[in-house]
Amino acid sequence: MELNRLVTEGRLQESLEIDQVSTLEMVRIINEQDKQVALAVEKELPHIARAVDLIAERLRAGGRLFYVGAGTSGRLGILDASEIPPTYGAPPDLVQGVIAGGLEAVFRTREGAEDSREQGAADIAARVRPGDVVVGIAASGRTPYTVAALEEARRLGCATVAVTNNPDSALAAAADVAIAPVVGPEVIMGSTRMKAGTAQKMVLNMLSTGAMIRLGKVYSNLMVDMQASNEKLRHRAVRMVVQATGRDEDAAARALEEAGGSVKQAIVALLAGVDARTAREALDRAGGYVREAIRLAQGK
């Protein structure tokens, strides 16, 4: 698809005078456009849900999740991947981000890196194995590096998902599931770090959060596999046990200590009325799902 025919490369009529208006009007124009992003993402919810189920299925079977992209899209993938271990207690290699140009490109643009199909295919081939799932991210849907990476992932037996802002793109064609929120032209023509990037971030939030919920790393709306690696998070762990069980802070803190800091284990112990060891055994039998572990610990 020619660049000038892409939705994301169009010229927004509402911002033609943005260089002449007051600062308040300037940010109002940007804000008005941003309001459209969530609505565009809403239209893609069925596809997002399919992708969540696909990712969870692969992860449950021992696969891993890879995000791949260039520029802003690549950085968003790395950002999302980096938050998974501390938030959900996942192994650091469970969700990984791959960016055109390597890690240096996270901080400084590597001109031309996105144009190499060969490097895109090579970067993915060096990392993935059959059973993994690869999410290609590109506003245009035509970035050579990302398209080639997704095509190579599919060839190697990975499940593939496309996150793009231009439907009917080469990236979408290489995906088992295509997610394409159409946010329209940017306030600054072609600056896809704006609405397109915001839409991508929202989609990635749903993909990773949804997958972690399906893997049992959330109980109610609590991140019960969180790694309490600092004082703030240790206090949060106590609060989560209090909120999940209705016990006071002293009881929650004791249960956490007996559970070796495991929020899940403390919750199961308190709600099932069992000791920490029994709670751990129930969680192991339940595959880490708190509700099922409580049922098993109670002998139901």
Swiss-Prot record:
It holds the Pfam family GKRP_SIS_N. SUPFAM superfamilies: SIS domain. Residues 55-217 form the SIS domain. Keywords: Carbohydrate metabolism, Lyase. GO terms for biological process: amino sugar catabolic process; N-acetylmuramic acid catabolic process; peptidoglycan turnover. CDD domains: SIS_Etherase. The active site is at residues 83, 114. Pathway: Amino-sugar metabolism; N-acetylmuramate degradation. Its EC number is 4.2.1.126. It catalyses: N-acetyl-D-muramate 6-phosphate + H2O = N-acetyl-D-glucosamine 6-phosphate + (R)-lactate. One of its GO terms (molecular function) is carbohydrate derivative binding. InterPro entries: Etherase_MurQ, Glucokinase_regulatory_CS, MURQ/GCKR, SIS_dom, SIS_dom_sf. NCBIfam families: N-acetylmuramic acid 6-phosphate etherase, PRK05441.1, PRK12570.1. Belongs to the GCKR-like family. MurNAc-6-P etherase subfamily. HAMAP family: MurQ. Homodimer. A lyase-type mechanism (elimination/hydration) is suggested for the cleavage of the lactyl ether bond of MurNAc 6-phosphate, with the formation of an alpha,beta-unsaturated aldehyde intermediate with (E)-stereochemistry, followed by the syn addition of water to give product. Specifically catalyzes the cleavage of the D-lactyl ether substituent of MurNAc 6-phosphate, producing GlcNAc 6-phosphate and D-lactate. This is N-acetylmuramic acid 6-phosphate etherase. It comes from Symbiobacterium thermophilum (strain DSM 24528 / JCM 14929 / IAM 14863 / T). The lineage of its organism: Bacteria, Bacillati, Bacillota, Clostridia, Eubacteriales. The gene is murQ.
